[in-house]
UniProtKB/Swiss-Prot annotation:
The dimeric enzyme acts as an E1 ligase for SUMO1 and SUMO2. It mediates ATP-dependent activation of SUMO proteins and formation of a thioester with a conserved cysteine residue on SAE2. Functionally redundant with its paralog SAE1B. The lineage of its organism: Eukaryota, Viridiplantae, Streptophyta, Embryophyta, Tracheophyta. Heterodimer of SAE1A or SAE1B and SAE2. The complex binds SUMO proteins via SAE2. Belongs to the ubiquitin-activating E1 family. Transmembrane segments: none annotated. This is SUMO-activating enzyme subunit 1A. Pathway: Protein modification; protein sumoylation. One of its GO terms (biological process) is protein sumoylation. The gene is SAE1A.
Amino acid sequence: MDGEELTEQETALYDRQIRVWGANAQRRLTKAHILVSGIKGTVAEFCKNIVLAGVGSVTLMDDRLANMEALNANFLIPPDENVYSGKTVAEICSDSLKDFNPMVRVSVEKGDLSMLGTDFFEQFDVVVIGYGSRATKKYVNEKCRKLKKRVAFYTVDCRDSCGEIFVDLQDYKYTKKKLEEMVECELNFPSFQEAISVPWKPIPRRTAKLYFAMRVIEVFEESEGRKHGECSLLDLARVLEIKKQLCEANSVSESHIPDILLERLITGTTEFPPVCAIVGGILAQEVIKAVSGKGDPLKNFFYYDGEDGKGVMEDISDSFTS
């Protein structure tokens, strides 16, 4: 991603942000290739932010046909059926993003992520999955980890007014300012599979309840063959049954996961634009840090709950069991 120097046009366009994070960081951004799959409200906010930041290219994957339902919280889809009729979500969002910053190459890739081989992911520096199944997240993360080069991997999921971000930067080196000098730092990230397989009992009780609740919902959707968000209040009994099974298997009290939180997650299928903006903005910030190699990255989960307006970072790894 080091590549050549910024062009005169790039320097002029990105002048303000260059003053914030420096020309070298901007140069890395303009050479970064990012794959984004699953474009709903939060991911739309993320895409807007990274396109405005001036990444090299963004490849979008979302074969859903654009319709009134897809319009929910996704400002990249114009509320005009004459514009979006017959087009996929990725195609419509691609057109909108090109208007934000013509210097960023925005393209569309069709197909199913879970059917793509390792070689496909090699062309990217960052992979972001929005609203994918647990199986898809595991599959893509595994493919990224098999590559010779390091590909930063992220997932994001917003339900009701709650949001989750997962980060896997593998073995990551970066610099940060300490006192008056820049110091070299290194972090080791667990894979998605490793992070969600950590036994619950050793995890501190103060850990965000959303971490556990999201795992319950993932297991429910997978075991019932549901797509992301295909649940309602009618499913609450089954969700609570799975919660009980997981708590017993992990030797923790069922109070670890409040029933009311699970109810919110399965009934709140509509995204909240303010939450989309917050979580999508944080995700964009983390990707920019990872690409530029400057600043402490998020390790490895982030949770936001619009009910109390609090965001927390949780480091979930096998360090709890060692």
